[in-house]
């Protein structure tokens, strides 16, 4: 269980009985952190620093914390109510005559609750099996029944694994699904504008390569849309379309400012041989279908011009580059990656649709007026989300206080990056459960 959920359960005024001793603390693993305004809805006029942050939860502690969450009265009451509602719906659909419109509504709700009710019942049955096993162990004679005790211990371990799996399955079912999670994305990277910009440009290339390698690691398709190189092997700007299974779900928290601290090895900054700090930005745009964003030709201005950069005499003779201007919003998209004007126009339209789609998503979220802001961040493009400290060989994600060593391995875009992304997803899921319980408690008052 994530520390944010521990904090919520520990501090909530309605949840009496959740004692501090239930949280197993090891002082050398924990450090203080001030919880920012993203958690304001849960602390409600409390200003405090909570000492509940672990950089590395062991699997044993995760299982214990998951069990504590399940045992808590708030979640137990919530699941009891859902189970009762499911049973009532089942009886109503079987025995009480209702009109067709109401029946469709009841069937939809019944289908929503069926998986949760099934998991809840299985958890109760498994807990009953644990109680019976513990009762049997207490009645055994230590000397005469040693073999039975060993068998009982093995059985208990098997049941523990099963019930932990059921807990996780239940929590996954409780988390609301985002409708954009299955979308493909357009990923853009841009070097920061700071003194000694070559360090930013080199870092931008490394981050772009990292996401390209991660796409291979996840067996996604990576299509290059734009690539503007810089001096000393750096990168000014690049964009790519990434398509595959659950791309936006995994990359949606990568958008933001990535910071680097290092002694440059090449470029003008390398002459001073001191630590430099630079930044680059990542933008992750969910890719819409044609039906999601319709472009009216009257709202567009299409300009063509000669491409810049390497390419021989061709770039000086043909107007292959394309610029699209969406007049109502003022969005401007350029593409000069391909030698063909038709291909550049196709890519530019694709990027423009993605940016307009992002505006639709943000507007949709504002209209929902959800009180929840993910602990993993607001995903604002101006938010600094991660620091890559080369001198200390450490990557730090500031949203969940996660740290990992071996930067070179992390930048390979394999297991290290995937583990961090999974932790971000877990943190967001657990915050969603905390909000769910918070709303349930408020409605019960």
From Swiss-Prot:
Modified how: Methylation of glutamine in the GGQ triplet by HEMK1 is conserved from bacteria to mammals.
Residue interval(s) of motif GGQ: 311-313
GO cellular component, one term: mitochondrion
Pfam families in the cross-refs: PCRF, RF-1
Primary site of residence: mitochondrion
SMART domains per UniProt: PCRF
Coiled-coil segments on the chain, per record: none
Keyword Mitochondrion applies: yes
InterPro entries named among the record's database cross-references: PCRF, Pep_chain_release_fac_I, Pep_chain_release_fac_I_sf, Prokaryotic/Mito_RF
Annotated segments matching region GGQ domain: 297-361
GO BP field: mitochondrial translational termination
One Gene Ontology MF term: translation release factor activity, codon specific
Residues modified as N5-methylglutamine: 313
Transit peptide feature, positions: 1-61
Keyword terms of this UniProt record: Methylation, Mitochondrion, Protein biosynthesis, Transit peptide
Localization per record: Mitochondrion
Domain notes: The GGQ domain interacts with the peptidyltransferase center (PTC) of the large ribosomal subunit to trigger nascent chain hydrolysis.
Family assignment from sequence similarity: Belongs to the prokaryotic/mitochondrial release factor family.
Function: Mitochondrial peptide chain release factor that directs the termination of translation in response to the peptide chain non-canonical stop codons AGG and AGA. Non-canonical termination codons AGG and AGA are found at the end of MT-CO1/COX1 and MT-ND6/ND6 open reading frames, respectively.
Name of the protein in its database record: Peptide chain release factor 1, mitochondrial
Lineage, highest ranks first: Eukaryota, Metazoa, Chordata, Craniata, Vertebrata
């Amino acid at each position: 269980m994530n520390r944010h959920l521990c904090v919520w359960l520990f501090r909530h005024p309605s949840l009496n009985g959740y004692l501090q001793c239930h949280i197993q603390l090891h002082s050398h693993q924990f450090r203080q952190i001030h919880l920012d305004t993203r958690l304001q809805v849960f602390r409600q006029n409390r200003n405090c620093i909570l000492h509940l942050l672990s950089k590395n939860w062991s699997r044993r502690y995760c299982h214990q914390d998951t069990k504590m969450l399940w045992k808590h009265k708030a979640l137990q009451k919530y699941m009891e109510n859902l189970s009762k509602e499911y049973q009532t719906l089942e009886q109503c659909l079987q025995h009480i005559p209702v009109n067709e419109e109401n029946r469709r509504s009841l069937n939809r709700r019944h289908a929503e609750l069926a998986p949760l009710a099934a998991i809840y019942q299985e958890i109760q049955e498994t807990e009953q099996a644990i109680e019976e096993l513990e009762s049997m162990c207490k009645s055994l004679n230590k000397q005469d029944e040693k073999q039975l005790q060993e068998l009982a211990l093995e059985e208990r371990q098997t049941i523990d694994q099963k019930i932990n799996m059921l807990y996780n399955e239940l929590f996954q079912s409780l988390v609301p699904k985002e409708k954009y999670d299955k979308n493909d994305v357009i990923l853009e990277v841009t070097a920061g504008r700071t003194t000694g910009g070559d360090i930013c440009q080199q870092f931008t290339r490394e981050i772009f390569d990292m996401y390209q390698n991660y796409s291979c690691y996840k067996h996604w398709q990576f299509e290059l849309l734009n690539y503007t190189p810089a001096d000393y092997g750096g990168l000014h700007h690049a964009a790519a379309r990434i398509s595959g299974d659950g791309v936006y779900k995994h990359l949606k928290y990568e958008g933001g400012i990535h910071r680097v601290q290092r002694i440059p090895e090449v470029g003008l900054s390398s002459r001073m041989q001191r630590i430099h700090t630079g930044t680059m930005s990542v933008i992750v745009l969910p890719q819409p279908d044609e039906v999601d964003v319709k472009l009216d030709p009257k709202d567009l201005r299409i300009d063509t011009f000669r491409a810049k950069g390497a390419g021989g005499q061709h770039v000086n003779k043909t107007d292959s580059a394309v610029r699209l201007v969406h007049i109502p919003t003022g969005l401007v998209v350029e593409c000069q990656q391909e030698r063909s004007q038709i291909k550049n126009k196709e890519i530019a339209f694709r990027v423009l649709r993605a940016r307009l789609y992002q505006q639709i998503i943000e507007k949709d979220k504002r209209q929902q007026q959800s009180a929840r802001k993910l602990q993993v961040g607001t995903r604002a493009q101006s938010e600094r989300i991660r620091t890559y400290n080369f001198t200390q060989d450490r990557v730090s994600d500031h949203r969940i206080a996660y740290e990992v060593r071996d930067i070179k391995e992390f930048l390979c875009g394999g297991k290290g990056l995937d583990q961090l992304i999974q932790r971000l997803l877990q943190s967001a899921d657990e915050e969603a459960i905390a909000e769910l319980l918070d709303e349930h408690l408020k409605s019960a008052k």
